[in-house]
Amino acid sequence: MIAGIGIDVAEIDRIKRAVEKTPSFINKVLTKGEQAQLATLKNQRYYEYIAGRFSLKEAYSKALGTGIGRHVSFLDVEIIDNELGQPVVVSHPFDGPAHASVSHTGQLVFTEVILEKGE
């Protein structure tokens, strides 16, 4: 049974500017595991990854119904790409499965997260 659905859109250039202005932005948004994946990327893909994780975590918090803040932080959720490049939610505070999808087009990243609960 679906417990929550969250969607988000982020501008890649806006995230790039945030990283360039405040390099610690990465430490506030990405877990150590996500930072390890990020370290393997270059050029535009580097910023797409950061924007994608930022947006996925926003979508996750919307599916949870809380938004990012007091109940869930960016670092409470870890999303790692599997060998096929699919984002997998490997760590999160919700008691049930979480499914993530991300798509990039031009300067935008679109994300969706679905949370499931048992019947």
From Swiss-Prot:
Q: Does the keyword Magnesium apply?
A: yes
Q: Where is Mg(2+) annotated to bind?
A: 8, 58
* Principal place of residence: cytoplasm
Q: Provide the cofactor list for this protein.
A: Mg(2+)
**What GO molecular functions are on record for this protein?**
holo-[acyl-carrier-protein] synthase activity; magnesium ion binding
Q: Which GO terms describe its biological process?
A: fatty acid biosynthetic process; lysine biosynthetic process via aminoadipic acid
User: What superkingdom does the record give?
Assistant: Bacteria
Name the chain's protein.
Holo-[acyl-carrier-protein] synthase
* Protein's organism: Limosilactobacillus fermentum (strain NBRC 3956 / LMG 18251)
